[in-house]
């Protein structure tokens, strides 16, 4: 049987690895079309419209049957391509956009949104004018509306910190996110979504709930399939710095059932906007009493979870499932096999070139570790969440076992421990 030609757009390192190690690899013929897109979603030189045309030509030339997008911005491209090519499956551009754009997620998809507001960046505007618009009491969580991977998030406790954050955003956001505008203005209605003509910053009330988790799954021909729930953990000394997420969740069954119901309600709203044939994960805050609030929605799979799902689930490989969806087949609901796993972040608060912060020699020798920087890359912008240099996937028989492994690896890999998240 001839292998299925599959195009992976804007691939990251982990996509190459996951496609090479996919079950039954002889079934597929993977093609990769690289792009100058950072994990954060930032880019100074990415011509999105030219890349989209390159995708069209590639699909025709190689008779591509499935297009895989495992990142936030590429999910928009995959959605548009699925509208243009009859043999491709995917979501509508509008529904993919509503997952990406955090302001419109709250406005149109989140059933019970937290308090939120938005700033439209303008370099000619006095900084003090921004503060007058926000009626939310401090503290705030502030973030660009269209970045990924928890990038450029800042916790703001007072007016001075708010002004500092705005000043930083004015310096970096316009240059790094403007590449999105031509695509959004072409395929969306600017009267319906006026923020696509600006570089907006989301301001949210700070939610001090003790638990954070993620419900992951997909929509296939209009049917919702839940993959599972993972727990997110943050460093106690730096509560905005993401430490890891572990799978499966240890939350009580009653709360997990409530999360699954909330997930399905959100996906039904997305389906009304045309969301289909794609993975989607929803991140939630969870209180001691079981109250839940939406953090954000990601309209794509979690590629770093693939190895974890493959080891902790029966029939749980998300790449295989996404290909099945792309071929018009509904994937089976996976089941737990008794193992536990986690994705652990190797994060720094240091500012230096990456090779002075991370031991690349050790990192390259570790199985299931994704390096997120190049040795010569300069790390200069550090928000409240720190800067993730790498992630490592660990699986074992207990959470205690994998946490001990992760703590040991962090201490081996970080060259400047004084800037580590646990200090």
Regions found by a protein language model. Give the residues of each.
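A short beta-strand motif that forms the metal-chelation/ATP-contact edge
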Residues: 78, 290-301
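Glycine-/Pro-rich loop/turn segments that contact NAD(P) or position catalytic residues
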Residues: 96-115, 129
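Conserved ATP-binding module of the ATP-grasp superfamily
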Residues: 139, 159-208, 266-272
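Conserved anion/nucleotide-ligand pocket segment
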Residues: 139-159
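ATP-dependent carboxylate/phosphate-activation module, predominantly the ATP-grasp catalytic core
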Residues: 205-269, 274-275, 298-321, 326
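A short glycine-rich, hydrophobically flanked beta-strand micro-motif that places a catalytic Asp/Glu
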Residues: 273-288, 422
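A glycine-rich beta-turn/hairpin centered on an aromatic-Pro dipeptide
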Residues: 324-369
